[in-house]
């Protein structure tokens, strides 16, 4: 017996429509609402995103997992987003949930998604809990992962 339900959840992000899935607990009220940010180039269907979201839903939490711009079924160009663009999309996800009456107080980020969640949390005062799973914590590691050049980032601001 499944004690959760799964629904498609689309919303507007920094580069167009973003495709998501929301895992909802079968019972009301929810114990909390979370947004899950996936790892670099992984997507909402990754094993980590799927398992964490479903497990939390079965424990009473509503969890939105979505594809960043340019990945999966989401619009946009993946190579044009950057860390701050992904953070913008997390903020958009939280705002879209609020429009549905779901107040997000938890951000969860896996790997690169953890870095994006940290960046987004600074703009979301309603977020009370920030969870990272294997998130990079050194700037050089993040830059190596995304193949970025410090001078280019400083000049472009992204």
Predicted regions and their residues:
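Alpha/beta-hydrolase fold nucleophile elbow
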Residues: 99-111
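The alpha/beta-hydrolase serine catalytic core
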Residues: 8, 18, 115, 121-158
């Amino acid at each position: 017996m499944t004690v959760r339900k799964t629904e498609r959840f689309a919303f507007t992000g920094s580069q167009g429509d973003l495709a998501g899935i929301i895992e909802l607990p079968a019972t009301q009220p929810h114990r909390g609402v979370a947004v899950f940010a996936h790892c670099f180039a992984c997507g909402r269907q990754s094993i980590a995103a799927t398992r964490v979201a479903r497990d939390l839903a079965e424990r009473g939490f509503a969890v939105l997992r979505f594809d960043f711009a340019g990945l999966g079924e989401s619009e946009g160009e993946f190579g044009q987003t950057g860390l701050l663009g992904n953070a913008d999309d997390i903020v958009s996800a939280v705002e879209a949930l609020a429009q549905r009456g779901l107040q997000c107080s938890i951000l969860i980020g896996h790997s690169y998604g953890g870095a994006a969640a940290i960046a987004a949390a600074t703009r979301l005062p309603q977020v009370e809990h920030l969870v990272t799973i294997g998130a990079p914590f050194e700037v050089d590691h993040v830059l190596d992962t995304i193949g970025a050049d410090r001078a280019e980032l400083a000049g472009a601001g992204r």
